[in-house]
Amino acid sequence: MKVPVLIINMKAYPELLGGGAVKLAQVAEKVANNLGASIIVAPPHTYLRQVAESVNIPVYAQSADPVDPGARTGHIPLEFIKDAGASGVIINHSEHRLLLNDIAMLVNKAKALNLETVVCSPDPLSSAAAAALAPTAVAMEPPELIGTGKSVSRTKPDVVVETVNAVKRVNGDVKVITGAGIEDYNDVAKAIELGTVGVLVASAIVKAKDWEAKITELAKPLVGK
């Protein structure tokens, strides 16, 4: 994972239907190339292969199930995510929570498959626990702020700093990013100022009227513009 980074979690918004997921990924790639910024996109599973074949920027899955391939109706093992072209996976988002042993299983298997991992956590203590598993990155997102427009970096800056320090104490190789309520340039700039190396953003981008303008706005602080 190249940092500083902007990770776009597309979630399952209706804007992605009918080719929207591919279009958004292509816009993200255009901005990444224009600014020289690191941008990762995470489309719904149903569009993973289509998006991965349409862009050269990293594509992550939004989640995975802690199971091996086999008689697993409705489950999505990591092997299938990798086969679809993803280079990483988001684990334990607040909208798709897992038990600690399941998180550990996914992180370990992802390493064996050469997939990057971003483990989401709600607070500094959970972030430290996640860091002990040695994922690629930990993304601290207070669930009460997700989708509110009240950014974690400006609403709870002390929690962001505490998370950065907690993760460093456990494993200095684990990258720390943050998310929840990230809406504009200042939110991202503040997150970087507080010691993180990136942000995880969803609705602010997917629901924006002008995807290119919004992604550009949020990516500029990552490259010092």
From Swiss-Prot:
GO biological process, one term: gluconeogenesis
Family matches, as Pfam families: TIM (PF00121)
Binding of substrate, residues: N9, M10, K11, I146, G181, A202, S203
SUPFAM superfamilies registered for this protein in UniProt: Triosephosphate isomerase (TIM)
Entry GO terms, CC: cytosol
UniProt-listed Enzyme Commission number(s): 5.3.1.1
Pathway: Carbohydrate biosynthesis; gluconeogenesis; Carbohydrate degradation; glycolysis; D-glyceraldehyde 3-phosphate from glycerone phosphate: step 1/1
Location in or out of the cell: Cytoplasm
Coarse class of the protein's main subcellular location: cytoplasm
Keyword Cytoplasm among record annotations: yes
KW Cell membrane (keyword) present: no
Enzymatic reactions: D-glyceraldehyde 3-phosphate = dihydroxyacetone phosphate
MF terms in GO: triose-phosphate isomerase activity
Highest taxon in the source lineage: Archaea
Functional summary from the UniProt entry: Involved in the gluconeogenesis. Catalyzes stereospecifically the conversion of dihydroxyacetone phosphate (DHAP) to D-glyceraldehyde-3-phosphate (G3P).
Assembly with partners or alone: Homotetramer; dimer of dimers.
Family that this chain belongs to: Belongs to the triosephosphate isomerase family.
Protein name stated in the entry: Triosephosphate isomerase
Gene encoding the protein: tpiA
